Amino acid sequence: MDASLEKIADPTLAEMGKNLKEAVKMLEDSQRRTEEENGKKLISRDIPGPLQGSGQDMVSILQLVQNLMHGDEDEEPQSPRIQNIGEQGHVAVLGHSLGAYILTLDEEKLRKLTTRILSDTTLWLCRIFRYENGCAYFHEEEREGLAKICRLAIHSQYEDFVVDGFSGLYNKKPVIYLSAAARPGLGQYLCNQLGLPFPCLCRVPCNTMFGSQHQMDVAFLEKLIKDDIERGRLPLLLVANAGTAAVGHTDKIGRLKELCEQYGIWLHVEGVNLATLALGYVSSSVLAAAKCDSMTMTPGPWLGLPAVPAVTLYKHDPALTLVAGLISNKPTDKLRALPLWLSLQYLGLDGFVERIKHACQLSQWLQESLKKVNYIKILVEDELSSPVVVFRFFQELPGSDPVFKAVPVPNMTPSAVGRERHSCDALNLWLGEQLKQLVPASGLTVMDLEAEGTCLRFSPLMTAAGMIS
């Protein structure tokens, strides 16, 4: 009995007090147990299953990842679940883990190591792709490099942009020129990133009379530039293609370079054909890209390397590159080059060149094979060096234009020609699906071109990971 209850003379009252205290304690204990149980149920209900308890072992976690990667085991796989990335791919993947470990170094060692990695990779890429005295910006989003280059061009043309901001552009609006054959959404992306209105974009049409219909019309571009200057606008930057997104054609970069120098316009080049700059033989149109102001490349797909960043090479301007965001002192930004730094050393120059050469040879072999097949039309710009092959089945109509498209003839009504075109497109769509199932590693794609209709594209440089064997 508690000492406080012992002081009560009346034993009956003391007993009642004791019983009351015990009863209250029982009620409190019961309430506490109920609250604890409800709390556990609440936690169990709110916390996802994998996080409950004291954690899981690594084997179980990796098993879960494997199941997620493979999907439902009962499904019949339509294509290989996991791409074989090869040993050089494992080196690139290692770069990401190694980068996380490097970040644990002390500040001075980290600075020296990241600077060395960035400078080495920049030098190697400039030498391989014949780009003299250039700097490199590594980025995950392929279009990000061009957005940074646009900022650099704005700062170089508008000296007071740092102080005045966008109000400094009002009196002389900048103009960015894009080819009609540019990849979809590029113009909108640039305007969103730069905060520019859509009228700052100028779409340059492709040739209609002479040359490739997927190649920028240089004469029309010059007319657009003159018109913009007369209206008080500032021609800022031109994006040229060394391999258009659709058919892999290259603009007349040499002529465009002369035009840009004449009017003080920044020339940026992008496209899959830039990979051929690493080869011994390079077409003159692509070789001219080595003299441009900047160019964006994607060595990851070209070499079959996973998780390797895109690279934009540009002419260095110490006063402006920092403010344009092309240079960063953050170790994490410099370490973006690490996977490529490791992979280039693993492959060596011979291995690097051999992969690009092999992809180009695959295109040449396909071209030679298609020439032997009746009713196959090939849309290739340069049969000797083009790494992209676009083709389609097409049975020419009597009196039709043999240059890859059907045109009305006197004996056929427009509706008959339309039905013929529709049937041909449907057949090419079926042909593409069949070829993709027969040779899934080919990376063959089916696309619709405005003038030609449904076509099949073979671009081994963009599917190099599947072409290793």
Swiss-Prot record:
Residues in the signal sequence: none
Biased composition (Basic and acidic residues): 28-44
EC number(s) per entry: 4.1.1.-
Domain of life: Eukaryota
Parts forming coiled coils: 12-40
Enzyme class: lyase
GO molecular function: carboxy-lyase activity; pyridoxal phosphate binding
Residues covered by region (Disordered): 28-47
GO biological process, one term: carboxylic acid metabolic process
Keyword Nuclease annotated: no
This protein's UniProt keywords: Coiled coil, Decarboxylase, Lyase, Pyridoxal phosphate
Entry GO terms, CC: intracellular membrane-bounded organelle
Cofactor entry: pyridoxal 5'-phosphate
Family named by the database record: Belongs to the group II decarboxylase family.
Protein name per its UniProtKB record: Putative pyridoxal-dependent decarboxylase domain-containing protein 2
